[in-house]
Design a protein with these regions (language model features):
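Catalytic toxin/effector domains delivered as secreted proteins or via bacterial secretion systems
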Residues: 1-147
Length: 147
């Protein structure tokens, strides 16, 4: 790994991170029935995409058994600020997610960690995104209850 590649893989505390949430897990998160983040995560700065199709294509979300399809009208992401990611990151697979070609953005695989206080869920549609809720450490607060 070159020095530039190594630097591209560093996650400093406070780095904005995000995880694409499979459609079947959005409601369990919002209802408080799911309280961990695990799997492939990305730095938010590496994922300035225009809509669900870009997420699907660039992040290789069409792996075998995936809930994602190229035709999704919306996609949900969870965003949070990294804390000590060294303790939760596992080495990336040599060939990318589920054996597909590596995404064109750095990907990180996190072992299960609790959803951090202040994490947010956003809904992304082509050309725009909508804030859905923020985690206060006990529940997800939606805009009508204060942001």
């Amino acid at each position: 790994m070159t020095q530039a590649e190594h630097m591209a893989r560093i996650i400093e505390p406070g780095t904005p991170m995000q995880k694409v949430i499979p459609p079947r897990l959005v409601e369990p998160y919002l209802a408080g029935r799911r309280s961990v983040i695990a799997g492939y995560v990305y730095r938010t700065m590496d994922c300035a995409f225009r809509g669900p199709a870009d997420f699907y294509r660039v992040l290789n979300l069409g792996y075998e058994g995936s809930d994602f399809t190229a035709e999704l009208a919306e996609i949900y992401v969870m965003r949070w600020r990294a804390m000590d990611m060294d303790a939760s990151l596992a080495p990336p697979l040599a060939d990318g997610a589920a054996g597909l070609a590596r995404p064109s953005v750095p990907e990180f695989y996190t072992l299960p960690i609790p959803v951090p206080v202040g994490a947010e869920i956003h809904r992304i549609v082509p050309g725009s995104e909508e804030f859905i809720a923020r985690y206060d450490g006990q529940s997800w607060l939606r805009p009508s209850r204060g942001r």
